[in-house]
């Protein structure tokens, strides 16, 4: 009999932090930034702390503050996305041990090759990272919400979550209920998302900055040739107002061909004698 082996997906290949243009060298995607070389002068790299008339203490304080970062997490009491206290880069490295889940894992319009990880009966239309976070919170598993991160195959739907599922190779906390590993967890998340389908009102539950106060919540038209959802977060590059993708929705103007100028022919008068 063939031997079946359990695949440990603790180190997820989709846990990527890189520019989209690095994955798309042809730069055919609407938001792929063109990588251009930059020239940096040596005098621009001088440390201002060693220049005369500057305060070295203030510079050291700024450096220490720059080493701190914040994370978004789901408050288990309120169910809302809240910001954590500033954490060091060392603690941030510990967070990267969490396993990653993307919305495209549950997209019913995608094939397994295009990013779907669950069976079609557990997939939904327009999956959102916030709904995934609500599902994990209901299961009692620690969850971190990263609203800006996105899967390279689903760059128009920003958002992903990190879950603390294993530690030292062992299931911990509420995750011990999922002996089947990450696949069983994704099945439970898919069942939750089937019970809570995505609507326009779902977008209001996602935290935004003040720049999005006057933006209307609505569905967006699909573009032929792109795998995209109709309901995406307001900070999605697929929105029609986004300067990087606005041209995708505009019909190109067809300019009439210019008429070529032909010089008049010389006329000759024939005189008969």
Curated annotation (Swiss-Prot):
One of its GO terms (cellular component) is signal recognition particle, endoplasmic reticulum targeting. GO terms for molecular function: 7S RNA binding. Residues 25-71 are annotated as: Disordered. It comes from Saccharomyces cerevisiae (strain ATCC 204508 / S288c) (Baker's yeast). This is Signal recognition particle subunit SEC65. Fungal signal recognition particle (SRP) complex consists of a 7S RNA molecule (scR1) and at least six protein subunits: SRP72, SRP68, SRP54, SEC65, SRP21 and SRP14. InterPro entries: Signal_recog_particle_SRP19, SRP19-like_sf, SRP19_arc-type. Keywords: Cytoplasm, Ribonucleoprotein, Signal recognition particle. SUPFAM superfamilies: SRP19. HAMAP family: SRP19. Residues 55-65 have a biased composition (Low complexity). It is found in: Cytoplasm. GO terms for biological process: SRP-dependent cotranslational protein targeting to membrane; SRP-dependent cotranslational protein targeting to membrane, signal sequence recognition. The keyword Transcription does not apply. Signal-recognition-particle (SRP) assembly has a crucial role in targeting secretory proteins to the rough endoplasmic reticulum (ER) membrane. SRP is required for the cotranslational protein translocation for ER import and preferentially recognizes strongly hydrophobic signal sequences. It is involved in targeting the nascent chain-ribosome (RNC) complex to the ER and is proposed to participate in the arrest of nascent chain elongation during membrane targeting. SEC65 is required for SRP integrity.
């Amino acid at each position: 009999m063939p031997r079946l082996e359990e695949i440990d997906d603790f180190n997820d290949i989709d846990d990527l932090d890189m520019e989209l243009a690095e994955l798309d060298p042809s730069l055919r995607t609407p938001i792929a930034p063109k990588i251009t070389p930059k020239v940096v002068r040596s005098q621009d790299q001088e440390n201002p702390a060693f220049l005369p008339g500057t305060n070295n203490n203030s510079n050291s304080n700024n450096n220490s503050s720059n080493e701190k970062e914040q994370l978004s997490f789901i408050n288990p009491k309120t169910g809302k996305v809240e910001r954590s206290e500033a954490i060091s880069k060392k603690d941030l490295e510990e967070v990267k041990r969490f396993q990653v889940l993307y919305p495209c894992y549950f997209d019913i319009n995608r094939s397994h090759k295009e990013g779907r990880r669950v069976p079609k009966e557990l997939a939904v239309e327009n999956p959102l990272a916030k709904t995934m976070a609500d599902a994990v919170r209901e299961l009692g598993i620690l969850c971190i919400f990263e609203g800006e991160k996105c899967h390279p195959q689903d760059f128009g739907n920003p958002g992903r979550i990190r879950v603390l599922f294993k530690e030292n190779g062992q299931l911990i906390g509420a995750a011990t209920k999922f002996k089947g590993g990450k696949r069983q967890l994704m099945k439970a998340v898919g069942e939750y998302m089937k019970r809570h389908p995505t609507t326009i009102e779902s977008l209001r539950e996602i935290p935004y900055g003040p720049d999005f106060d006057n933006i209307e919540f609505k569905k967006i038209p699909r573009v032929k040739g792109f795998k995209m959802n109709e309901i995406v977060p307001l900070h999605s590059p697929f929105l029609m107002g986004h300067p990087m993708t606005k041209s995708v929705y505009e019909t190109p103007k067809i300019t009439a061909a210019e008429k070529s100028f032909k010089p008049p022919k010389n006329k000759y008068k024939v005189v008969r004698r």
